[in-house]
């Protein structure tokens, strides 16, 4: 959220581009003027860029505020990146942390640029409503900067072309035929002038090249930030994502944003680079003549080859991206539902699915890699082949070839190579950018969450004269992209008929309370979603003020922050309203259990809160708002009856008494409290009126209500036994008693992997791990030899040409004419060794080609093998990791490894490594040749090398730290996006989209700043190393002049040609080495997960393999003195638990939140290791049983029914063990057969992400059917009916009683009606076993009332037990904070040390569970059953 120190300044300048730009208090007046000038499209919008053209600037406006210093850079600092130097200098002095990375410039911030891009996008949609183009919008967005970059780069090419064509050629000609004075002495001044000219043009080339990247980097950052921010804004404001998932959006942030950045930054090189071919062709025709057409033809042939390779790479990359999306989507589901995967022993099943996705992905990556490597391998071959064919043709045709012409031509060929190399670069980046833009455009075209018309009547808050809503948009029949393969979690076609929600006439007045009831799947929730604006309609006639409407979905959404943050939700604190919301939602006592109360951090998705606490926090958030209309979707589903009744009384009947309210409920007892009841069937409101009138006059309504009440009565629904969670809490409630600081301090060190900047140097073991993963040292040795042979053959071809030229021109013919001797040099064509040299020249060409193909193919195989093994090791470590790892590690952080890091290892790391090896070996070869030609060069090379070592060694740490900072800054960004999408409906209805967008901008700018700093630091190294090579080139040229006559022109020309080529290759080699090391951080991060995630346990132990296949046959469970402690610093979650459950016995477990109920179940599944003690199943210590055997022998039905994307069959039988008849039988027993038969594909029908195309009740029945198929002897239900209506609850209870009659059944209960018919009931308190007896013993007689109440701010749970009818009940004098009249006075409190029981005297014969409340003074004692 925006910090308190930020000053929000909204620019009010009409309907301009920047109406809602947020300025911090550090934002300069110059920046604000820039925004205004850009808004008005005046020349002033270029003022910021013009400032960088000032040669020298000394002001440092951003020195102390963390802003980017590029805004204050002068021209020299801008083009040489000297403004980065202070940061790199700090890196030399010690370890840097993330906070020292300079922030993003205001001019590059995503907020400012998103505003402009949004206007352009809206203009495009208006101009081309049917087919708007994001490509056109981005072009308009960057056109000025793009063409300016192209112009600068054009000058760079001109400078680079002038050097070899004008000055180097003349320098070599000077060496061949030096200018002499009258005394035949060489005149060096002309040669020195040529050296100076070469130095100047090379210096200008380097600076203009650096300027090109400086402009392009800022352009790329602006495009990436603007597009991602606009994407997030559109997604956050969309009605529905139309089948797209969180992982799809995160994948765009992780990969597509970077692809846009790469495409934009390389665009000037791709657009202008090929122009050098035109200049090269003209020069060669002028100098070499018509035979140069052979070389030109070679370039065009290779152009065609490169184009084919590029096209193939494009197609393969597109398919690879689709396959990657499928894998990431499945990984997101696995991580999200990891407990379900583990408890069912499905690790191998999902490993097989991921392995299959990975294989499909590798096929396309391999093809793309081959195309890319062959394109890279073609690069060095092209100028050599062109030169060989050109020179051989010239010589064999009888023409002479001078060294000056030959080596200037070779230099030009290598300059032309730049244009050739841009083709694979351009093809790759363009292909990926096109795919990225196409995918992003789909999100930008999502239908937006628009406001409804506001009703005119003052006393009416909602008015509808007839409307029909669906979950699918109007354009549901849009054409399908044939080239795009659907991801696993996409709902391609939902076979069920399109669900519609209709109501002819509906109005709600102020202060009117309306209940919505109906059977499971009838459309109750749909009505609330339609009113809140989250469904699609074609005939909307609904009028409601959405800004005055609050919607609370059944599944509570909690974001990572404090409890107070979640309740205030961006609003200012109002103590009175806040207290009423917290107190009315029964949160006061819960806050006292947290170490810092409502300032306690709740973790990702509220990880440290139970399900009931999450629901009440979400409700308090809504109650804190002062709105006119409240929409509650079964908010009491995850709460016990007592707590629900209290909240209903305090919140619904009192606090919201004068507000309009519509609430979905399954509690028939509450209907008489509502003014009206809506009865829903099949998506239609079939009855609307007062409960009593409908009950008397509407038979269907009466039948439904009677059925629900009968079920509740016959099942003995009384008081609850705890406010159990609606979803499985990642950490058991015992951990809740520890502060968020404890969680952070004691959490796995894997968390600090993201927080710590790590060591500044990549350890050698990381390289060894990569080498071993690739196949070991032998294969790498062969690969390096292939690179060396390829480079040597390349250099040898030029060396051999110099030998040929030298040999041919050194031969002489003596002519005798009397006493005169005339010595004449023969031409190269007349030399008798021409054939030999030409043949060797051609052999070098063959070796060069073969070695290039060899190293390209082998490198692709080696790098992909390494990536595959690293991925597989990490995946196996994650899926078999301990549950505690997932408790303490955010989902986005894990997905970051499988998406961004694996993309680096799959694609970018191999490319960088291949280029590094090629260029580094080439540079070493060039230096060897130069030194052999000019031994004096060593005198200069030594100090140059020292300068080089100082440059590289001093700043490698800073560059690597910047790369780590970029990695670290991604995780908060992804976590925020993921959390936002999970709570999108809440964000909409609470009008918080803008606030969450501001948080996104903050995270995105932080990430953009790190990316820009890293790229700028890399370019700093490149520029200064290029300048170092310019000095080296000048030295070689000077030696050529000074040693004229002692060194052959051919050798001198070869040395100069190699020195000039090094100007680009050397810095690229060093930069790619540093970039390679930076990209190795991805290998480091992946390897860290692979090696450091604690294991879940032995998958198959030796003892486990010897156990009979029928184990467990009886289902007997024994706990012997079992203790459980989640972390060393935490108290015992289970304390000395000993009990025995007989085979086939039905046991209910009750206790308050934090009592240890879920911990006990966790131990049976071995989700956590036992601290002390032993657990036996059928007499076998479960620690000796493999996890797969143990967990597949136990069935688990969780509270939150979730299905995986795929098919119905896969969700019922993922291991394909059962026949169709067995599956249909299970579906029939679970009352799902009719539903599945109605689907077009029956068992092969598609299931969407999370099973969202089925209702909650249907998903729960599917989970029950899955457990039924397994035929386990032990079944554990973690309150499987907590979130379903009474009808579904009844079905589930019937299935449990009939189908699992012979199995051992353990029910973790939050409703007493679900355990009162058990054989025995286990009562846990604070991790201790308080009581384990029959329901008859626990309840005694019918007149005994067992109450385990929820606690409010000064009241604790109690069990009122009447021994006779003569007890009395009095009103507590200390109950001033309670507005209920039914408060019992504790007259006598006595603690029984042996039974841990508090006795209460009450004095009323009819103590009702729903109305009595018990006060007690002990702060940590629950009132228990009196035996």
From Swiss-Prot:
What are the GO BP annotations of this UniProt entry? cobalamin transport; transmembrane transport
Q: Name one GO cellular component term.
A: basolateral plasma membrane
The record's SMART domains line, in alphabetical order, gives:
AAA
Knockout mutant characteristics:
RNAi-mediated knockdown in larvae does not result in any obvious developmental defects and animals are able to reach the adult gravid stage and lay eggs. However, 80% of the eggs laid fail to hatch, and the animals that hatch do not survive beyond the L1 larval stage. RNAi-mediated knockdown in larvae results in the heme accumulation in the intestine under low heme conditions. RNAi-mediated knockdown in larvae results in an accumulation of vitamin B12 in the intestine and defective vitamin B12 transport from mother to dead embryos.
> What domain of life?
Eukaryota
Query: According to its UniProt record, where is this protein mainly located?
Result: membrane
What is the recorded function of this protein according to its Swiss-Prot or TrEMBL entry? Answer: Heme transporter required for the export of intestinal heme to different tissues and subcellular compartments. Also, required for the export of vitamin B12 from the intestine of the mother to the embryo to support embryonic development.
Family membership, please give it: Belongs to the ABC transporter superfamily. ABCC family. Conjugate transporter (TC 3.A.1.208) subfamily.
Q: What is this protein called?
A: Multidrug resistance-associated protein 5
What gene makes this protein? Answer: mrp-5
